[in-house]
A protein has these predicted regions:
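A contiguous strand-loop segment
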Residues: 1-93, 126, 311-315, 322-324
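Broad, structure-driven detector of short, well-ordered beta-strand segments within folded domains
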Residues: 68, 149-153, 275
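Catalytic cofactor-binding cores of redox enzymes
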Residues: 121-159
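Beta-strand residues in well-ordered beta-sheet regions across diverse protein folds
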Residues: 15, 76-77, 152, 161, ...
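Short, surface-exposed beta-strand-loop junctions and turns on beta-sheet-rich folds
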Residues: 20-22, 81-83, 156-159, 166, ...
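Proteins synthesized as precursors that undergo proteolytic processing into mature forms
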Residues: 92-128, 240-248
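C-terminus-biased signal that marks the final domain/tail of proteins
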Residues: 1-13, 127-130, 135-136, 145-147, ...
Length: 324
């Protein structure tokens, strides 16, 4: 289970939580422009846009969970179990394996509009990375500073949806998530007025009562509504520190604590990491469950004309600043 969001102040930000019961050994990974992408069904790509994101690098290949390229286009894959249905290889189409989807788009597209054009020719197939890394059931959000879309490959084919809220979680399918926001049209950051009955002297007794009815559980539909509301009402200054801090607060509204989401006896889903990328500057910020101090990797401090992945293991030890 995961949550992705966009946010815009002076710069454009893109990020997500990754919620699961264990980690594969994720690393912040920079793919430079001349790293050779060898695709399973398409020709290799030797020169492309550089990108930075979170990946589990296997056999010197970065299957990204989320990433942003040097042009400011971001993309994240989130669990879509039970609904994701990939296609068989088709002649005359650009056949892309599910685990290649993020590199395929970010290597060649600078904007959401360009990504839409690539998607028109693409066939998303269920080729697994390996026997040890089977196909993941995912859907994706792709976003730049001007637009966001959701891509879902289901039983009847590939669907692309405009995403006016810039948020994605998991099930149900995106159109249903958007429809269910109708349930919360009464929710407001302002204090409510008495519409129950004018003859009753009803009054607020606490701050925040305009938010009554906003869900607080950890289900994907509830997280979608909670983050959409939080993001659309969040106010931030335009500095980098203020913007990044506010982005982490937005996604912090749906963090999962160990013990609150049991997936099987004795195993619990937690927010393994939360990311926030300044897509304009190529800086990848993150926190982990064990370490709340924000870490940062700047892709532009790397040799982006190189041909070798740059990998940064996550800093997982809690950083506590003692002030006396």
């Amino acid at each position: 289970m995961c949550t992705a969001a966009t946010y815009k102040t002076k710069d454009f930000y893109f990020g997500r939580t990754l919620d699961y019961e264990f980690s594969y050994g994720d690393e912040v990974t920079v793919t430079p422009r001349n790293f050779c992408f060898r695709f399973r069904h398409m020709s290799e790509v030797k020169t492309h846009y550089a990108m930075i994101g979170m990946a589990y690098v296997a056999d010197d290949y970065p299957p990204y969970y989320d990433a942003v390229n040097e042009k400011g286009l971001g993309m994240a894959g989130l669990n879509f179990v039970g609904n994701a249905k990939y296609q068989d290889v088709q002649a005359g189409r650009e056949n892309v394996a599910q685990f290649e989807f993020i590199p395929w788009i970010l290597s060649q597209c600078a904007t959401v509009l360009e990504a839409r054009k690539v998607l028109e020719k693409m066939n998303l197939v269920g080729t697994p990375y390996s026997e040890k890394l089977p196909c993941a059931s995912l859907h994706w959000m792709i976003a730049d500073k001007d637009a966001a879309i959701v891509v879902e490959c289901v039983e009847d084919g590939l669907h692309v949806y405009d995403n006016p809220v810039g948020v994605l979680t998991n099930n149900p399918p995106f159109p249903v998530q958007m429809f269910m926001l109708n349930n919360y049209m009464h929710v407001s950051p302002s204090q409510p007025e008495n519409h129950f009955a004018k003859e009753l002297p009803l009054a607020t007794y606490s701050r925040g009562m305009g938010g009554l009815g906003l869900p607080g559980d950890l289900s994907s539909a509830s997280r979608f509504a909670k983050v959409a509301f939080t993001k659309l009402h969040a106010i931030s200054g335009e500095s980098e520190a203020e913007s990044v801090s506010q982005f982490f607060h937005i996604l912090g509204s749906v963090e999962q604590q160990r013990g609150c989401c049991e997936v099987e006896p004795g195993k619990y889903e937690i927010t393994i990491y939360t990311s926030c990328v300044n897509a304009d500057k190529g800086i990848y910020y993150y926190t982990t469950y064990e370490n709340h101090q924000i870490q940062a990797v700047d892709m532009h401090r790397e040799n982006l004309d190189g041909d070798t992945l740059r990998r940064y293991p996550l800093v997982n030890e809690e950083q506590i600043r003692v002030v006396n």
